[in-house]
Amino acid sequence: MTLEMMGSMDLDQIVADAQQSFEQAADITTLENEKARFLGKSGALTELLKGLGKLDPEARKTEGARINVVKQQVEAALTARRQALADALLNQRLTAEAIDVTLPGRGAGAGSLHPVMRTWERVEQIFGSIGFDVADGPEIETDWYNFTSLNSPENHPARSMQDTFYVEGKDADGRQLLLRTHTSPMQVRYARMNRPPIKVIAPGRTYRVDSDATHSPMFNQVEGLWIDENISFADLKGVYTDFLKKFFERDDILVRFRPSYFPFTEPSAEIDMMFEQGKNAGKWLEISGSGQVHPTVIRNMGLDPERYIGFAFGSGLERLTMLRYGVQDLRLFFENDLRFLRQFA
């Protein structure tokens, strides 16, 4: 569908079709499939927006405004149907779990740490035992720290690797603000405030436009960084392999490093692990991204890349938690279902 076709296209009909499709969706899965027809990467409205670049500036402004109004109406209908389905599901659950108020009361139960927080604290403890500091940084980050300082300048193709939540407004220097897409900006922030040798991990929340059984719009990540004059890839392999064995409390773990690409490391590697025993025996499981810190990043830290070298890695805390406890769906961590959470108390 292109803008050349808009002469015969009734935008009101798109709204009507979307409202009807959403209203007829009997469950969330069907609703998300219908959403893709209109708002997905190849959806009707998305295709129209892509075609705006072919118009002259005045026409682009006019047509863009019309399409955005329609997009807002479609999104409003989608939100309303999502809420209606959620309400119906809740009412169904409440009916099934009706409480008999004549039964004796229950005593107050003690709370416990969320499984992801258990992982967070365990990671800090393990790396702290081998001399790593723990650092924290802002979740609303500047475009420069999140991308440019990490060897992804404006229009660099690596920026297309992740969809980003941008924030209205700019910082004091006029730089674009966004919700950080990884904890890697702490590499540069920490190194600018501390002199080598640098050994630090930076756990924290990160944000990307993604949501399915293995991805969440918000997820927790831990960044690791070691900078000194003689740090090699062998140090990375030794440190991370030792971490995995301590984290999973078993020695039957094989680790491999697959060549990969990240703009902020060179060489780069994906880290996979495999248990020699148990239900996951013989399966390679992706666990982390890693590599030697790129000279450009070291230079942006205010250090001389001819003198200093180091390694970095980034691991998802939910991913580690899923593997440790055998959880199949990442979204379970965010639903606050006590029946699920009590298993880890």
UniProtKB/Swiss-Prot annotation:
Protein's cellular compartments: Cytoplasm
Cofactor(s), by name: Mg(2+)
Predominant cellular place of this UniProt entry's protein: cytoplasm
The UniProt record lists the keyword Cell inner membrane: no
Gene Ontology molecular function: any one: phenylalanine-tRNA ligase activity
GO CC entries: cytoplasm
Enzymatic reactions: tRNA(Phe) + L-phenylalanine + ATP = L-phenylalanyl-tRNA(Phe) + AMP + diphosphate + H(+)
Highest taxon of the lineage: Bacteria
An example Gene Ontology biological process: phenylalanyl-tRNA aminoacylation
Cofactor info, note text: Binds 2 magnesium ions per tetramer.
Alphabetized Pfam families for the sequence: Phe_tRNA-synt_N, tRNA-synt_2d
Gene3D superfamilies: Bira Bifunctional Protein, Domain 2
Keyword terms, alphabetized: Aminoacyl-tRNA synthetase, ATP-binding, Cytoplasm, Ligase, Magnesium, Metal-binding, Nucleotide-binding, Protein biosynthesis
This protein's record includes keyword Transcription: no
EC identifiers of the protein: 6.1.1.20
Protein family according to the UniProt entry: Belongs to the class-II aminoacyl-tRNA synthetase family. Phe-tRNA synthetase alpha subunit type 1 subfamily.
Subunit structure: Tetramer of two alpha and two beta subunits.
NCBIfam families: pheS
Protein name listed in UniProt: Phenylalanine--tRNA ligase alpha subunit
